[in-house]
Amino acid sequence: MKGVCTRKVLYFFMAVILFVAIVASEDTENRNPAMAMPLQRMEQEVEKVSSRCGPVACPGRFCGSDLGACRPPWCCRGCSCSFCCKL
């Protein structure tokens, strides 16, 4: 009988800890919206960059040999390498 009672108390505390962990994680997401929807923010960034890219924004020049350079089939606008566009 004592073992059953101890097990019930243990399960109760485990449930309380789980509940507190779930509530705390939801609260963290609400406080930091940047962490709540990183995928949506990434999609917006890709859309923003792709709207600037294309034949008009890409003069077809490829930046030089430095490590951060755009390489074919990517070109950089004005050869500044601020962002790379796919031809």
From Swiss-Prot:
Top-level taxon of origin: Eukaryota
Propeptide: 26-45
Tissues expressing the protein: Expressed by the venom gland. Not found in the whole body.
The keyword Disulfide bond belongs to this UniProt entry's keyword annotation: yes
Location(s) in or outside the cell: Secreted
UniProt signal peptide: 1-25
Post-translational note: Contains 5 disulfide bonds.
Alphabetical keyword list: Disulfide bond, Ion channel impairing toxin, Knottin, Neurotoxin, Potassium channel impairing toxin, Secreted, Signal, Toxin, Voltage-gated potassium channel impairing toxin, Voltage-gated sodium channel impairing toxin
Domains: entry comment: The presence of a 'disulfide through disulfide knot' structurally defines this protein as a knottin.
Family: Belongs to the xibalbin-2 family.
Protein name: Xibalbin-2
Organism: Xibalbanus tulumensis
